[in-house]
Amino acid sequence: MALIVHKYGGTSMGSTERIRNVAKRVAKWARAGHQMVVVPSAMSGETNRLLGLAKELAPAKTDTAYDRELDMLASTGEQASSALLAIALQSEGMESVSYAGWQVPIKTNSAFTKARIESIDDVRVRKDLAAGRVVIVTGFQGVDPDGHITTLGRGGSDTSAVAVAAAMKADECLIYTDVDGVYTTDPRVVPEARRLKTVSFEEMLEMASLGSKVLQIRSVEFAGKYKVPMRVLSSFTPWDIDIHEEAKSGTLITFEEDEKMEQAVVSGIAFNRDEAKISVLGVPDKPGIAYQILGAVADANIEVDVIIQNLSKDGKTDFSFTVHRNDFARTMDLLKEKVLPSLGASEVIGDAKICKVSIVGIGMRSHVGSASKMFRSLSEEGINIQMISTSEIKTSVVIDEKYMELAVRALHKAFDLDQA
């Protein structure tokens, strides 16, 4: 008997009929003798609906008190879907109980709307499992040291599921979604994209950080830190599919690099539309400038991605970096109001119409020429590269967003990713 964690996304929970199918699938696993913990997302569109109501009431509000109420509001979406799934399981003859994050409890810090999990108390869940119940834990949320409900940010249910799996020392965490695994790139952009049977943890971490929507990056970080066995598979296969066939479907996230994986120089093309570029011009070229700029941004809980500092000329330089597009206006205001006056820079400019395109592959460690091949391919399509970022197993470029799909298709073809 294994302890298995299932996570279901919003599309998988998108209607009562789909919730019923999820219940049948979970019941099948439980009847096969497994202890089952399920982490569902809110029903598709529900979180956006709830946050939209808040925006109607306070369009421009952005402070801690407001963010606290947003978390109270948004958390109800997962609470509703969890209770509905428990009811559906009970209708299938399965003993089941649902818990909100604060009831478990899943303990987080106090960063409302972007909280991070600090610990999970597994006593209550283990007691229910020992009694033969299926336990449903709300994704996306927890409770801070002061008893306030917090949410983990977009995609937080993935993180919840992997964190629960880590805390429970689960045998496997299965992430059910609306796609049947991890692909070489988004099939909606490149129809020839292939599903990967396995992908290394490092590659998945890079893909998640670079914009792949299959898994949320913090969930992959958790999986890597605690060595949680993880698989991505489709919730739209028939619920009564043979359980052994289902257990081997989708894409396995592996922590071992086998020979076949070594042979692939590039495993996938990732892209992210949600980027914005900010440039601080005419910055005095002296020690501490990077900290003055990025320290203030970090203090505002804004994540920075690609960073470039130009060569100095006449004692001045330009400093550019990218942030999430949702943080663009806030970052611009912060720099203009609090940083620019004390910095001695000439101005701050921004561009929210950019995107990031990346090639990823563990084979890049031991093969040269992948970056130049990428640059040549983009050049042949007339695509200008604005910024470049590299690591051992990825190369990313920032380009005009209107060329994103062209760039992805060109790179997918250049690296022969349509061929097995």
Regions found by a protein language model. Give the residues of each.
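Glycine-rich beta-alpha junction loops
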Residues: 43, 179-181, 226-230, 234-239, ...
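Short hydrophobic alpha-helical runs that function as membrane-insertion/retention elements
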Residues: 172-176, 230-232, 305
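Acidic-aromatic/histidine active-site loop/patch
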Residues: 223
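A conserved regulatory-domain signal marking ACT and ACT-like small-molecule sensing domains
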Residues: 243-420
